[in-house]
Regions:
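Loop-to-helix entry region of an early transmembrane alpha helix in multi-pass inner-membrane enzymes
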Residues: 131-145, 150-171, 342-349
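Membrane-interface transmembrane helices that cradle and orient dolichyl/undecaprenyl
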Residues: 181, 217-233, 411
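Transmembrane alpha-helix segments characteristic
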Residues: 15-22, 365-385
Length: 425
């Protein structure tokens, strides 16, 4: 069934989703008049979008029921988390962020507020540059904030968008998993479960770009995987490179390498492989210049320095484990409510530590041969996270989600005992 979806048909499905992303907030805007009603309007908007995505790509009634459950469950998780840890009186207020938040949370919300004000005076297509936005990656926030020009710019209204984004990512990854002949049914079930309830995206009650950015990258990966002609491949690469750059500057390099890898891996001719290597080096230098010009010297030094490589084995272990010990969560929350979002980092660390143990324990049977574009991209993002000076678990988990089909095919249902071992620690 999934083999019937071609590059062109998937592109048509994307246009339908994009059209609804534009139209639904406008249609629901009359109902978004207060904190409660605007939150409900946002939930309805992105619930419809989620169901449409599942219907268009996965099609089966089982998947529709499953993702309905996943959407509602994640909305409840985010709502309970915010009301319990942050602001129990949120819905009787104006929907503004808590004044106790860290500076970066407040400046992001303030930047979006200024963007919405500029749109009201200059039109919906007003574009703020980085200097005016005064926050990193302003490009992606123009898309993230669009629905809330109509549904009101309130903190919790972004929660349903985060849920939709994470579930659309899950749909795309599971779709590619089902198209692969090397993934068995047991592995597919694990991929479906873990991607739809991915620990790093469970606490959706905040304004951040990661769920939406990773969703866009997953769309790019599907386009690359479905492309056959040279035009389709070039178009897919451009799309993936742009959205990867929007999410995190260094990801444009990884998008280029992962796109190039598929052609290189399939080619048997040595001369052609050498030609691909030559083209790859040229492309790498060109993309590297783009990232260097977009970042400060200090930021670039965080990725390219000797210590990053020398300390890589240790950084891999600590990056996979995340914040530790996990029992420090309750003490941290007392210091600042923003630490309450680290709960998903602890959950992600537990999952990733089990992932690491499983690979070490099964290293003799684990195969890194014939990796597909999605897996290469995932490992590339993980590596960039390990090498970065500002390493934190989110940088690693953004890549790890793309490696799950490969990982569960390697360890299969045996992962459960490694997860339990990690959880016990």
């Amino acid at each position: 069934m999934y083999q019937n979806i071609t590059f062109n048909s998937y592109l048509c499905k994307l246009f339908i989703v994009a059209a609804l992303f534009v139209v639904l907030p406008i249609a629901l805007s009359p109902f978004a008049t207060a904190t409660v009603s605007s939150y409900l309007a946002s939930c309805i908007c992105f619930f419809i979008l989620t169901i449409v995505c599942v219907k268009l790509i996965l099609k089966g009634s089982f998947y529709i029921r499953y993702y309905v459950f996943a959407f509602i469950a994640q909305i409840i998780i985010g709502l309970m988390h915010y009301l319990y840890f942050v602001d129990p009186h949120y819905f009787v207020g104006t929907g503004q962020p808590s004044s106790a938040f860290w500076h970066e949370y407040l400046t992001t919300f303030d930047a979006i507020e200024r963007l919405q004000e500029a749109r009201r005076s200059s039109g919906i297509f007003y574009w703020m540059d980085a200097y005016e936005f005064q926050n990193s990656h302003p490009e992606i926030y123009h898309f993230i904030s669009y629905p809330f020009f109509f549904l009101q710019n309130k903190w919790m209204n972004y929660s349903p968008l985060n849920v939709f984004s994470s579930l659309f990512t899950s749909v795309n990854i599971y779709f590619l998993c089902c198209r692969s002949s090397s993934v068995n049914e047991e592995s597919k079930k694990l991929v479906l479960g873990w991607t739809s309830f991915f620990p790093s995206f469970l606490l959706n009650d905040m304004i951040w770009r990661d769920p939406f950015g990773i969703c866009l990258i997953s769309i790019g990966v599907v386009l690359i995987s479905l492309s056959n002609s040279a035009i389709e491949k070039f178009f897919s690469f451009i799309v993936t490179a742009i959205v990867s750059f929007y999410q995190r500057t260094m990801y444009i390099l990884i998008a280029g390498i992962s796109s190039f890898w598929g052609y290189f891996n399939r080619t048997k001719n040595i001369g052609l492989k050498l030609f691909y290597v030559f083209l790859g080096i040229i492309a790498f230098v060109y993309l590297k210049n783009i990232t260097d010009s977009a970042n400060t010297e200090d930021y670039n030094a965080g990725y390219v320095n000797a210590m990053s490589y020398l300390a890589l084995p240790i950084k891999i272990i600590f990056g996979m484990i995340g914040p530790f010990p996990w029992v420090q969560f309750f003490k941290s929350v007392e210091v600042n409510v923003a630490y309450s979002w680290q709960l998903q980092d602890y959950l992600m660390g537990t999952f990733q530590f089990g992932y690491l143990i499983a690979l070490f324990h099964n290293w003799k049977s684990v195969s890194f041969k014939n990796l597909d574009t999605m897996t290469i991209l995932g490992f590339g993002i993980m590596l960039s996270g390990f090498l970065s000076k500002q390493m934190h678990i989110g940088y690693i988990s953004e890549g790890l989600i793309f490696t799950l089909p490969w990982f569960f095919y390697q360890v299969r249902v045996g992962y459960a005992r490694y997860f339990k071992l990690s959880l016990s620690i």
